[in-house]
């Protein structure tokens, strides 16, 4: 497992630099190399490949320490306007991006740090112990209910009092809808403690209630869950291709292509929220047959490379 985590982590970092960067920009000259979530997950896998040799309680402690403690770094970052240099930026600093020049025409952009993802990945590794054969479904459901409810409750309480866990406090707005939006507007890049509790809490509750779910909808969800990275790569290129088509249909010319950091994305270009959701649903439906095929292919073939995609 350690070797697999190490090599897959390195593979993800390489893919982020070469394949995913191209998927975001369609720039064969690679004038900007984008380091986002996949590189952060890759670095986290590399770190986990060493941590798994430690005793399980130590691994669990490290995971919780990172998850619960990484927002302590928010204060020095805010006091220095997020300008603490390369190391700090690739480890934790949220918001904006850090530019690392390679030469006069090529740069690496670090959009957010890996630390919080490392904590989540460590706890995910520990979470897998609940799926051992020695743990019954009934036991697992009780534990998941307790964890999920505790996470949701912690989010509501800490967020309500604007306590620890997110650098963006909520505030009362001019109407109820905007106040609710402010309450749930937490930091995703990288995921804050509040974002993690808000998303993983309900997800764990979902696992508690729907482990025995069967039928077409269950197969639909499981298919994407079994080939998540394959879906990620496909959806990135498909959405960017659709963006390129929409760009020219909207009447933009070549002079608007080189908007930075993403090509074919001039500042005023876009659609209303309902259209964004419609496109999102359409992309999922379009990619489902392809993901279904790849899932079946992986299930019937044992080539080592398939475990890396």
Give names to the regions the model predicted.
Residues 1-309:
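Alpha-helical transmembrane segments and their immediate juxtamembrane cytosolic regions
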């Amino acid at each position: 497992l350690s070797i697999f985590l190490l090599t897959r982590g390195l593979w993800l970092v390489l893919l982020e630099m070469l394949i995913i960067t191209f998927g975001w920009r369609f720039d064969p000259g690679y004038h900007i190399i984008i380091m986002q979530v996949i590189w952060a997950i890759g670095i986290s896998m590399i770190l986990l490949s060493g941590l798994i040799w430690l005793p399980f309680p130590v691994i669990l402690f490290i995971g919780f320490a990172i998850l619960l403690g990484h927002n302590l770094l928010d204060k020095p970052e805010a006091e220095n306007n997020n300008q603490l240099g390369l190391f700090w930026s690739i480890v934790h600093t949220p918001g904006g991006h850090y530019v690392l020049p390679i030469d006069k025409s090529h740069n690496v952009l670090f959009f957010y740090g890996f630390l919080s993802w490392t904590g989540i990945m460590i706890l995910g590794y520990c979470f897998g112990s609940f799926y051992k054969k020695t743990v019954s479904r009934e036991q697992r459901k009780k534990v998941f209910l307790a964890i999920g409810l505790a996470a949701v409750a912690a989010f509501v309480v800490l967020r309500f009092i604007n306590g620890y866990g997110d650098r963006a406090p909520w505030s009362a707005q001019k109407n109820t809808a905007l106040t609710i939006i402010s309450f749930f507007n937490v930091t995703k890049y990288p995921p804050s403690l509040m974002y993690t509790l808000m998303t993983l809490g309900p997800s764990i509750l979902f696992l508690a209630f729907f482990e025995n779910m069967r039928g077409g909808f269950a197969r639909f969800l499981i298919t994407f869950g079994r080939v998540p990275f394959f879906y990620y790569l496909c959806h990135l290129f498909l959405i960017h291709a659709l963006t390129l088509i929409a760009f020219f249909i909207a009447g933009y010319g070549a002079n608007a292509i080189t908007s930075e950091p993403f090509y074919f994305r001039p500042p005023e270009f876009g659609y209303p929220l309902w259209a964004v959701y419609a496109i999102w649903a359409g992309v999922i439906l379009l990619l489902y047959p392809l993901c279904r095929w790849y899932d079946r292919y992986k299930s019937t073939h044992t080539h080592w490379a398939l475990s890396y995609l």
